[in-house]
């Protein structure tokens, strides 16, 4: 039975990945979930799998080398999937220190622990081991022209403390691959949405606020463009890179769903209006009048767009969820009697 060590598995993408893996592999794998349980981590995301015999939760900080080394000493870890990170740009602007500590130093701890556990006396590594570092398209900076895309060869140009910390962690992983031939991959993904996302992020924030008749804040002119990917498609991509990706390679994961932020808000409002039944008091609250333009974020990148050609051609991955369908599924979670 292959054992996966998943960091940050109580967070948004990590918990969706764990659900995806158990749905696909059931009892063929074992997952050890390591999470510090910061504000963005929630074990309720994993309530329905917590009693599985092939699932273990360990509350630990990835910056705690002793705790991480102990996990490797007590378990034969085959794969590491490293999600754990501070990820909110606004928070990084106010407090960059924690982003550098968690995203950079935490990644270094994970790399050193895996290297120590997997390295053989001759400097090679045990067969079948792999470390997958999950990163973001924000490390590439901003695109100005329509038709431009981020490729794996695009130079890094981070503009926020968050993206700088992720770029630094990417470079650490790359340095271990280059220096030690450490068995790893890096994935850089576009914006995710779907179940279990923390409500400070754009899509859940807009859905929650609209249903409560609260202001819908829009940075600047609202025309900043992001490429959106349903989170289960991201989980599928990570699994496929683990299984089929060439060692030492980086793979971009994107959905070719480029939308302006203001377009996202209008799509959500239209979807909620369509979904809410007549007589539901929330239907009257959902209105374009709630849209409020606010001062733009410092260093706000104008446009992100991923070219996923490499992962499609080499690994066979493709996104299955159309944006409109994914938004509808996400809105349904928040309008149901037991919203996630």
Residue locations for each model-derived region?
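Glycine-rich Rossmann NAD(P)(H)-binding loop
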Residues: 7, 94, 191-196, 218-226, ...
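Hydrophobic "lid"/C-terminal helical patch
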Residues: 17, 238-242, 268, 327-331
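Glycine/proline-rich active-site loop of Rossmann-fold NAD(P)-dependent oxidoreductases
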Residues: 167, 185, 192-205, 212-214, ...
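Mid/C-terminal beta-alpha module of Rossmann-like enzyme folds, strongest
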Residues: 244-296, 308
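Conserved small/polar residues in nucleotide/adenosyl-binding loops
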Residues: 334-340
């Amino acid at each position: 039975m292959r054992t996966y060590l998943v960091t940050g598995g109580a967070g948004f993408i990590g918990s969706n990945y764990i659900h995806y893996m158990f749905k696909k592999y059931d009892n063929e794998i074992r997952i050890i979930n390591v999470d510090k349980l910061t504000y963005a981590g929630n074990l309720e995301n994993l309530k329905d799998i917590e009693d599985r015999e092939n699932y273990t939760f360990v509350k630990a900080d990835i910056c705690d080398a002793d705790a991480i080394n102990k996990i490797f000493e007590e378990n034969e870890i085959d794969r590491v999937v490293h999600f754990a990170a501070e990820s909110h740009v606004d928070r990084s602007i106010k407090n960059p220190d924690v982003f550098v500590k968690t995203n950079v130093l935490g990644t270094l701890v994970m790399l050193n622990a895996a290297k120590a556990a997997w390295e053989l006396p001759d400097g090679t590594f045990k067969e079948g081991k792999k470390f997958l570092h999950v990163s973001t398209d924000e490390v590439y900076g901003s695109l100005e022209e329509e038709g431009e895309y981020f490729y794996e060869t695009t130079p890094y140009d981070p503009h926020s403390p968050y993206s700088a910390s992720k770029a630094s962690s990417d470079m650490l992983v790359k340095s271990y691959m280059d220096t030690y031939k450490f068995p790893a991959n890096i994935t850089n993904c576009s914006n995710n949405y779907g179940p279990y996302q923390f409500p400070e992020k754009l899509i859940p924030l807009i859905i929650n606020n609209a249903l409560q008749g609260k202001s819908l804040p829009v940075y600047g002119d609202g025309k900043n463009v992001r490429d959106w990917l349903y989170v289960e498609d991201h989980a599928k991509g990570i699994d496929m890179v683990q299984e089929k990706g060439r060692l030492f390679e980086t793979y971009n994961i994107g959905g070719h769903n480029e939308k302006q932020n203001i377009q996202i808000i209008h799509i959500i409002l239209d979807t909620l209006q369509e979904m809410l039944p007549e007589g539901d008091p929330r239907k009257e609250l959902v209105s374009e009048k709630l849209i409020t333009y606010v001062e733009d974020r410092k260093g706000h990148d104008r446009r992100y767009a991923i070219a996923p050609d490499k992962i499609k051609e080499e690994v066979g991955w493709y996104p299955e969820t159309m944006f409109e369908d994914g938004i509808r599924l996400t809105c349904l979670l928040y309008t149901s009697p037991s919203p996630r």
